[in-house]
């Protein structure tokens, strides 16, 4: 059970926004390697583990899971904030305001998704969800430093995983928990 918990936690902490899953694959390989005869990663970041049978007549079986996660992509900078009106995967933008995020630069920069203040809004606008284009990422950067973050930089949730009893909560668990389950088949 300890190893399952560690695998879930480590994989949830790994960054792997769709199209750039290499970091998550490296973490996954750490758990896969002791269970198979060989591992390798292809140019697209896909991780393969091969376990050979001692029976030369054995059938080949494929077990697979994916390790990507939904996220956002930087589309510009304004007043030291990052624009991100592009979502990668099924992001529900209504849940984004005040969410902790990680901008996947080297080193990673932490931030929070901000929304416009309601002071200038009409009564009709107040209480309605913000449009994705209204949201920005605040990393506490100067305008000059924000401009150094290239358009196209991926952004993932900054949620820390946690356990409540035997229940696990964290980002990207829909994909990563499936991988952990495959380790025990």
Language-model features: locations:
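N-terminal hydrophobic/helix-forming segments and targeting peptides
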Residues: 1-185
């Amino acid at each position: 059970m300890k190893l399952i918990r560690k695998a879930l936690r480590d994989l949830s902490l790994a960054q792997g926004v769709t199209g750039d899953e290499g970091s998550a694959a490296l973490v996954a390989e750490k758990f896969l390697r002791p269970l198979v005869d060989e591992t390798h990663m292809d140019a697209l970041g896909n991780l393969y583990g091969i376990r050979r049978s001692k029976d030369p007549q054995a059938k080949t079986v494929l077990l697979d899971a994916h390790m990507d996660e939904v996220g956002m992509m930087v589309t510009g900078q304004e007043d030291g904030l990052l624009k991100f009106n592009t979502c990668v995967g099924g992001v529900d933008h209504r849940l984004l305001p005040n969410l902790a995020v990680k901008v996947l630069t080297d080193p990673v920069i932490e931030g929070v998704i901000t929304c416009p203040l309601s002071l200038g809004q009409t009564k009709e606008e107040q209480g309605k969800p913000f449009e994705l284009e209204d949201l920005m990422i605040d990393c506490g950067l100067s305008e000059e430093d924000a401009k150094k973050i290239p358009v196209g930089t991926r952004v993932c949730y900054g949620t820390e995983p946690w356990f409540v009893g035997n229940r696990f909560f964290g980002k990207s668990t829909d994909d990563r928990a499936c991988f952990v389950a495959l380790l025990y088949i």
